[in-house]
Amino acid sequence: MNEFLIRKAKKGDKDAFCRLMDEQVQSMYKVASAYLKNDEDVADAIQDTILSCYENLKSLKQNRYFKTWMIRILINKCRDILQRKKQITYTDQLPEMPFYEEEYASKEWAPV
């Protein structure tokens, strides 16, 4: 781990942050791929992690734990994606039910 890049990135050096992330992309890809099956979801998790790391880098207390901190953020992002996907119900997976009009049309027009 390049502590020099971490220190520079914490001071606001965008190039140092980009180089730091370039060093970590392969590790992030491996971890995210273990959690997520879809490459688009993996890319989203990595992108969200990079953004979160950029926004919160100053909160990192010990530079030597940067990778652990970053991977924990990535895992949380992966879990968020999995949770969102779990809440989505696809219409092709719903049981077929009769349409309202078909079921009640004869009753509505029936003589009273």
Cite the ranges covered by each PLM segment:
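Extreme N-terminal regulatory/targeting segments of RNA polymerase sigma factors
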Residues: 1-4
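Short, charged helix-capping/linker segments at alpha-helix termini
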Residues: 10-18, 29-48
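Sigma70-family region 2
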Residues: 10-11, 37, 50-65, 85-86
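Hydrophobic/aromatic residues within well-ordered alpha-helical segments
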Residues: 20-24, 28, 74
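Phosphate-coordinating loops and pocket residues in cytosolic domains that bind phosphorylated ligands
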Residues: 22, 47, 71, 83-84
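Structural recognition of an alpha-helix C-terminal capping motif at a helix-to-coil junction
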Residues: 30, 44-51, 55, 64-76
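Arg/Lys-rich amphipathic alpha helix in sigma70-family domain 2
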Residues: 58-61, 75-92
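Internal acidic/polar
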Residues: 88-112
